[in-house]
Regions:
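Terminal RNA-binding accessory module
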Residues: 51-128
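Conserved C-terminal portion of the radical SAM core fold
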Residues: 1-47, 67-75
Length: 128
């Protein structure tokens, strides 16, 4: 129940109708997915997809990408809230960004903390 589950989604593939996109967005919204990686379809030479019609206008592809990124943000916020107060192991990276360091919990919640040399590349128990 505490797993962070992500999904990769491509928007704007040739032939994607408004109805297809709405059905996909509604399906994703109904699932216990924690976050999305949203990709906008782009043409690639020497692929069969170049022959599929109709081609989705790039502006509509970007609009659909934004809609799903907003959905992803909202899902991640809800997931983080559902983990509030839980103690999770966090792997902190060694990067010092303006006195801060970042890491990810074992269920993919991004954590920012004041930089501490002794935490570099270490797993620290952290209250979410």
């Amino acid at each position: 129940p505490h797993a962070g589950i992500g999904a990769d989604v491509i928007v704007g593939f040739p032939g994607e109708t408004d109805e297809h996109f709405a059905a996909s967005a509604n399906f994703i919204a109904s699932q216990d997915i924690s976050y999305l990686h949203v990709f906008t379809y782009s043409e690639r030479n020497n692929t069969q997809a170049l022959e599929i019609k109709p081609v989705i206008p790039i502006s509509l592809r970007h609009e659909r990408n934004k809609i799903l990124r907003t959905l992803s943000f909202n899902k991640m916020q809800a997931f983080m809230e559902s983990n509030a107060g839980a103690v999770r192991p966090v792997l902190f990276e060694s990067v010092n960004k303006n006195g801060m360091m970042e890491g990810y919990s074992d269920n993919y919640i991004k954590i920012a903390a004041p930089f501490r040399k002794e935490w570099e590349n270490s797993i620290v128990n952290w209250t979410i």
